[in-house]
Amino acid sequence: MPVTVFAGPDALRLALRLQSPGDYVVASNWNGPGSVVIEPDVAHRTRQCPCCAIRLDLVDGLLRAARRARRPRRILLVADPSDDLTTMTYTLLSDADLARHVRLDGVVMAVDAVAAATRIAAPGLLGNELELDALAVADAIVLGRSGELTTDGFGRLVSALRDVNQVGHVCAPALSARGDDRPDDDVVMGLDAWHGAPTVSTAGPSVSRRDRDDVPDTVVLRQAAPLDPDAIDEWLTWLVDTHARRLLRMQGALAVVSASARVCCHGVRSFAMSHSEAADPVTSRRDDSLVIVVGHGLDVDELSSGFAATRAR
């Protein structure tokens, strides 16, 4: 069952606008029809280890929704502004009970275009640290009230969003033919964005935000030749082990010499998982590899050289 996570100050409003019959909304600040109420309850798989924090209430709430007598069509999970989205995605991906019932479909960031444009004109950041972390990993960024911006103001806002996010697409429904703030369902849901080859909006090798510690880095790594299986496995283990506390998202599609199809991998914090791309719609053999790493304090040169060394000799 697909789970779409909504984040941002306007997340609940957007989720409720998109809710259709058969959808369940799981949130801490909504108790309406077709909803499951949760209250943040964080535990640690290893005592006091922040890289393995898990939301117990999220596990319980999603399982309650998924096990309803009338099975939901999909689940719309709304993050409270004070929630750590990384803990939520870690819980969704790493909990074995959840994995049997639900699948992370994508992260949608709801942004008030007027408020965001005002902040960057100040000048300032697009949000606080939690909001920036969510923005950096979002698969869709929905701009509310985008029709109230000037053409120049809209362009500056999209450019600022692209400085932080390199994995998602920007949606401005108010500028569409319909002209309201409700995006089409297929723009923000049904993405299955965390389990296959990553989508990257930049053509460059990497994007770095070294100038500010509170703005996440995004590093994009590419190889045009097959990889050595032992070398890439060792590199991925090193990546997760050394970056777990600051790893917001890792995702890749790897052409390994010993595999008939590319190997897809994804992870967050201390969790990582892989599967064959043959399980996804695209099954043809490709020799190109792509990995995105989103986190804080990433060393672009270290990541690039380590990944380059995994090339098969």
Segments from the language model and where they lie:
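Residue-level signature of catalytic and energy-coupling elements of molecular machines
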Residues: 58, 107, 232, 293
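N-terminal phosphate/diphosphate-binding loop that engages ATP/GTP or pyrophosphate donors
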Residues: 9-73, 80-83, 87
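Short hydrophobic/aromatic beta-strand immediately N-terminal to the Walker A/P-loop
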Residues: 3-7, 76
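Non-catalytic terminal/linker segments enriched in charged/polar, low-complexity residues
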Residues: 4, 16-20, 310
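Phosphate/Mg2+-binding loops and adjacent switch elements
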Residues: 60, 68-173, 178-179
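C-terminal accessory "lid"/substrate-recognition subdomains
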Residues: 130-279, 298-300, 310-313
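A short, charged/proline- and glycine-enriched loop
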Residues: 1-3, 214, 287-289
